[in-house]
Regions:
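Hydrophobic alpha-helical membrane segments
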Residues: 1-241
């Protein structure tokens, strides 16, 4: 007589459980000294350069000269490029691979491809948000992994959009929730610093504290983005044994 043993199916992971795992990994990555130092410097150096150049955009009565605008544009591009390297460092740490700024360096050719691909994707996200917020958030979640997919060598050009869509299938809600929480918390903290410190008579501390917050969010943003990609990649159907 045959004996049948009932084996329960594995419990389906909930969005909250996935988000919690991402946050735990992001916290771990954000504690890695190499990631902290690189992420903080990528944020602080442009701020210090602009302060040294007496950047005029803070005063609406001042029209900046063309060299100042060029400097700002170069700093923005350089910061975006180097942020990709910080994210790659965090991803390498999560994969228990050697971590180093030069070791995980993102070549300029890759950074340019990321920019070329993501500009139209961001334009579509903005248009979707203008029509209604939900389509914009949906597109943001769907294409959010395109940059790291290109850095990771899983895609080269616009195939990154399809690869990201496959990775995020079934995980869009927790991804959107995490990014919204981060953006709201950052905006609230920045506003509190800008309004609260002058009220307390500490107006001179607004700028350095704002820089410190930006540096911390630079590290956290890179770690969170890497943790999202790492967990999605681990759960991808084609990577399951």
């Amino acid at each position: 007589m045959s004996t049948f043993v009932y084996v329960p199916a594995p419990t389906q992971e909930t969005p909250a459980e996935f988000a919690a795992e991402v946050v735990r990994d992001a916290i771990d990555a954000a504690r890695e000294p190499a990631v902290v130092i690189a992420g903080a410097l990528v944020s602080l150096v442009p701020d210090l350069v602009l302060a040294a150049l007496r950047w005029p955009f803070h005063d609406p009565r001042t029209t900046p000269a063309e060299p100042a605008i060029t400097t700002m544009a170069c700093l923005i591009l350089a910061k975006a490029w180097l942020t990709l390297t910080v994210s790659n460092m965090a991803l390498a740490w999560l994969r228990r691979q050697p971590v180093g700024f030069l070791r995980n360096w993102v070549p300029v050719q890759t950074a340019l491809r990321v920019g070329v691909v993501n500009i139209p994707l961001l334009a579509a996200i903005v248009l979707g948000s203008l029509v209604f917020v939900v389509p914009g958030l949906y597109l943001l979640a769907m294409w959010s992994q395109a940059p790291l997919a290109m850095i990771d060598g899983r895609a080269r050009w616009f195939d990154a959009a399809n690869y990201s869509a496959s990775l995020t299938d079934g995980y869009k809600i927790p991804l959107v929730a995490l990014w919204v929480i981060v953006m709201v918390a950052t905006a609230a903290l920045t506003s509190a610093i800008g309004a609260g410190l002058p009220f307390l008579g500490l107006g001179g501390a607004v700028t350095p504290i704002t820089w410190a917050v930006r540096a911390a969010m630079s590290v956290w943003g890179a770690a969170l983005g890497a943790a999202m990609y790492f967990n999605l990649d681990e759960r991808a159907p084609w990577n399951r044994v």
